[in-house]
A protein has these predicted regions:
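Active-site beta-to-alpha loop of glycosyltransferases that engages the nucleotide-sugar donor
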Residues: 37-51, 69
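Acceptor/aglycone-binding surface of glycosyltransferases and processive sugar-polymer synthases
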Residues: 93-94, 99-118, 123, 135-219, ...
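Short, acidic, metal-binding catalytic loop of nucleotide-sugar glycosyltransferases
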Residues: 51-60
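A conserved acidic beta->alpha catalytic loop
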Residues: 67-76, 131
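Hydrophobic helical membrane-anchoring modules
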Residues: 1-32, 55, 188, 212-274
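Acidic helix N-cap motif at the loop->helix transition within catalytic regions
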Residues: 44-48, 72-81
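Short beta-strand/loop segment that forms part of the nucleotide-sugar
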Residues: 37, 60-70, 97-98
Length: 274
């Protein structure tokens, strides 16, 4: 039943500056963490994103780009960038998963996250390639995950301290808040940013969820994954972030994705009641 969810385990980390990047204990900084970054026509954004991530004081961080055969050459750009980023032991800090079928953001994430866990990541971070998610918050999110034992840490736009880009108009901001309230109300959760895509998962949580069982192809993947984590009693923490608008390229949101996002919470609720 929906009411059986462990809502007390949905909590927020103390509010902090959206640009904060606290130093981690050395052992924590070396924790195997893989950033999974789906791409489609992100040639203009990817080089800058790679430099930001590789410049973080997180020796354990690896980047897995999941490219859906981008016609603008993003996949080859990713391969070229990977050659220039090696760990101290000579192993690559960046790799590329090439997919031949463009069948949705959710499926790209699922493929990348499964590979990351298979390759030994202790934590997996979902991150957009368009610069909307703040790389400066990754260390803080990892620290929260490791200090609390949370299965999921959400980079949240809607907890105290979280903010949205000024480039978003009032209509877009209202629509985003409505989408969060819509999904959370139907599913009976108190996660403030259930639709957000900047999420850090423990490998344990991902194995328990079983990525192959996730049915969402598009953006509703974010909602389905969080709901499944709560159903399995994993603690969910939320850390405030500032969400930027992309400056290069176009959004991949389309009508089919929007319709799936409307229908998916009802499907998840119906399955939970069986």
């Amino acid at each position: 039943m929906i009411g059986e969810q462990k809502t007390p385990r949905e909590t927020s980390a103390p509010a902090a500056s959206a640009t904060a990047s606290p130093a981690l204990p050395d052992a924590w900084a070396h924790t195997p963490l893989t950033v999974v970054m789906p791409t489609y026509n992100e040639a203009g954004n990817l080089p800058g994103m790679v430099e930001l991530l590789m410049g973080l004081e997180l020796p354990g961080l690896r980047l897995l780009v999941v490219d859906d055969s981008s016609p603008d050459g993003t996949g080859q750009i990713a391969e070229d960038l990977a050659e220039g980023h090696l760990a101290e032991d000579g192993t690559p800090r960046m790799s590329v998963l090439h997919r031949t079928t463009k069948d949705g953001l959710g499926r790209a994430y699922a493929a990348g996250m499964a590979k990351a866990v298979e390759d030994g990541a202790a934590y997996v971070l979902q991150m957009d390639a368009d610069g909307s998610h703040p790389s400066a918050k990754i260390a803080e999110m990892l620290g929260v995950a490791m200090s609390t034992g949370a299965g999921l840490v959400v980079g949240s736009r809607y907890v105290p301290g979280g903010t949205l880009s000024d480039a978003w108009g009032a209509h877009r901001k209202l629509l985003s808040r409505w989408a969060n309230a819509y999904a959370s109300t139907i599913l009976g959760t108190r996660v403030r940013d259930i639709t957000g895509g900047f999420n850090m998962w423990s490998a344990e949580a991902l194995r328990a969820i079983d990525l192959a069982s996730v049915g969402s192809a598009g953006y509703s993947f974010q909602v389905e994954m969080k709901f499944k984590a709560l159903r399995r009693d994993f603690q969910v923490m939320e850390v405030p972030i500032h969400f930027e608008d992309r400056t290069v390229g176009e959004s991949k949101m389309n009508l089919a994705v929007q319709l799936e996002s409307i229908a998916m919470p009802w499907k998840l609720r119906a399955r939970a009641r069986r």
